[in-house]
């Protein structure tokens, strides 16, 4: 049985993943700190605070597995600094909290094109986040790099609305992927006992494993 920490549970991938975790018999405890209350989620410890770091600090029980599904855009965040806080600082804080509480496996949603040396700000921050997690020397670290995510968001992103039809037609890693499939693969990966070290799942690999 596993005790799980998940951040980003109000997001597209995280929302699907939280519902899957609630119904997963191998999971017996879920901590899901959020900025706003989740509502009626039986069996879920949901500390909430507008400052996610304060909600995260309320998680003190032992943890086995950490899922981080945090992610925004520079437009949504409002500034470069706010984007870095959401997609780098809070992700690293989630990981550090999990390690402190005994977790052995970290699974994180990154993005296709993540590269700490990228000339593109978004990809660079995602790459720097990945490098920060790798530097923590997790026994198991799984990094998911999906392409454009498909699914119903509470607030639609304009670029995704415009380009979603195109990304459905693209080949390989560029082809869009259903957020539910990303969540399904992450859950399956968390239950695999045999792999250790760093596993990076490209968008095409995520689609393949979801089939």
Curated annotation (Swiss-Prot):
GO terms for molecular function: NAD binding; oxidoreductase activity, acting on the aldehyde or oxo group of donors, NAD or NADP as acceptor. Pfam families: NAD_binding_10. Disulfide bonds: none annotated. InterPro entries: NAD(P)-bd_dom, NAD(P)-bd_dom_sf, Semialdehyde_DH_NAD-bd. To yeast YER004W. This is Putative NAD(P)-binding protein YraR. It comes from Escherichia coli (strain K12). The lineage of its organism: Bacteria, Pseudomonadati, Pseudomonadota, Gammaproteobacteria, Enterobacterales.
């Amino acid at each position: 049985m596993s005790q799980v920490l998940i951040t980003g549970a109000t997001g597209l991938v995280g929302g699907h993943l939280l519902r899957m975790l609630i119904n997963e018999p191998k999971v017996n405890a879920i901590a899901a700190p959020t900025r706003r209350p989740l509502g009626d989620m039986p069996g879920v410890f949901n500390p909430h605070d507008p400052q996610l770091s304060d909600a995260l600090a309320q998680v003190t029980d032992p943890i086995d597995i950490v899922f981080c599904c945090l992610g925004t855009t520079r437009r949504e965040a409002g500034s470069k600094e706010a984007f870095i806080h959401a997609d780098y600082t809070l992700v690293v804080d989630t990981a550090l909290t999990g390690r402190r509480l005994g977790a052995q496996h970290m699974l994180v949603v990154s993005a296709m094109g993540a590269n700490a040396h990228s000339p593109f700000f978004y990809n660079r921050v995602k790459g720097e986040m990945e490098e920060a997690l790798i530097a923590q020397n997790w026994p198991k670290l799984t990094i998911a790099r999906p392409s454009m995510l498909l699914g119903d968001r509470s607030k639609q992103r304009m670029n995704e609305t415009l380009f979603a039809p195109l990304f459905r037609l693209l080949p390989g890693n560029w082809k869009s992927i259903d957020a539910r499939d990303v969540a399904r693969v992450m859950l399956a990966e968390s239950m695999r006992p045999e792999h250790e070290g760093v596993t990076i799942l490209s968008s095409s690999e995520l689609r393949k494993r979801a089939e």
